[in-house]
Amino acid sequence: MADSLADIKKDRRFWQRMLRFAGYYDGAIDGILGTKSKAAAAAWDEDAQRIKEVYGTFDERTERNISTLIPQAQRAARVWCAEAVRVAKESGFDVRIICGTRTYKEQDALYAKRPRVTKARGGQSMHNFGLAWDFGVFQGKTYFGDSPMYAVLGKLYKLVPSVEWGGTWKSFVDQPHLQLNKYPNTAAARAAFES
């Protein structure tokens, strides 16, 4: 999985699609980082910095993962995370965002893993479009993959307009998953991303 925005930027075509999808770029998806791409990236960076200043910063891992999201999702993730950190701390836990954007290639590699950890191939997950993040519950360095805190923290999505929580899904409950509810389904998000 992309560990930072720098990892996302290595796939130049994917990065241009992210910039276009987020509304910063209207040039060709050609993998050439010319004047338009650079200006779009600078605008993204400026907005991301403003969002950080307004909504605060978190631990290094969370910051790396938030940075991979489109700025609108970064804002939502920061609002959710501020409250989640407070609530987790009251119960003796830590919360970190452990995954943000994944390229299609990274999604396919995750799909191929056994045991199966996702039902989505590349282009079939909101993570592929910078709209989704997963969180983890910790005590110090100890990760809890299964904890009642996932339900407690996941329900905080209600405090953030336009965010949905995977814990409310009927067919595939995904308690660590939150996403910006900008598109009615993954197919619509993919169509917008690839247009």
Question: Predicted segments — roles?
Answer:
Residues 57-96:
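Active-site acidic/histidine clusters and adjacent loop/turn architecture
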Residues 3-13, 17-59:
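Short acidic, glycine/serine/threonine-rich helix-capping segments at coil-helix boundaries
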Residues 34, 103, 127:
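Short, conserved phosphate/pyrophosphate- and ester-handling motifs at nucleotide-, phospho-/glycolipid
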